[in-house]
Amino acid sequence: MVHMHITAWALGLILFFVAYSLYSAGRKGKGVHMGLRLMYIFIIVTGFMLYMSIVKTATGSMHMWYGLKMLAGILVIGGMEMVLVKMSKNKPTGAVWGLFIVALVAVIYLGLKLPIGWKVF
C-alpha cells in the first residue's frame, strides 16, 4: 500500500508540473488537469487506507502525527489545485505557491520522520 501511495504522489506531482508548464506556455492543459484530479482521488484513498491501517497499531502520539501528515497532504493537494486554477485564469499565484511549498516540505519531513517512512532523520 505504501508503494501505491508513493507512486500516486509521484505521478500527481509530475502531472502537476506538466499542467503548470502547459498553462504557463498559454496552451490548454485541461486534459492533464483532469487526469491530475483523478490522481488526487487515488492519493486520498490510498492515504486514508494507510492511515486506517496505522491507527490499529499506533501507540502514544503516533495517531496525532499521522493525522497531521494527512492534513498537510490534503493542504498540498489543495495548493496544487489552487495554483493550477489561478494559472488558468491568469491570476497571481504567489501566496498559493507558499502554501504549496510549506505543506509539501511538512509532508516530506513527516513522511521521512515517522516509523513507516525511510530512516533519514
Swiss-Prot record:
It is a multi-pass membrane protein. It comes from Bacillus cereus (strain ATCC 10987 / NRS 248). This is UPF0344 protein BCE_1257. Keywords: Cell membrane, Membrane, Transmembrane, Transmembrane helix. The chain crosses the membrane at residues 6-26, 38-58, 65-85, 92-112. Belongs to the UPF0344 family. It is found in: Cell membrane. GO terms for cellular component: plasma membrane. InterPro entries: UPF0344. Its main location: membrane.
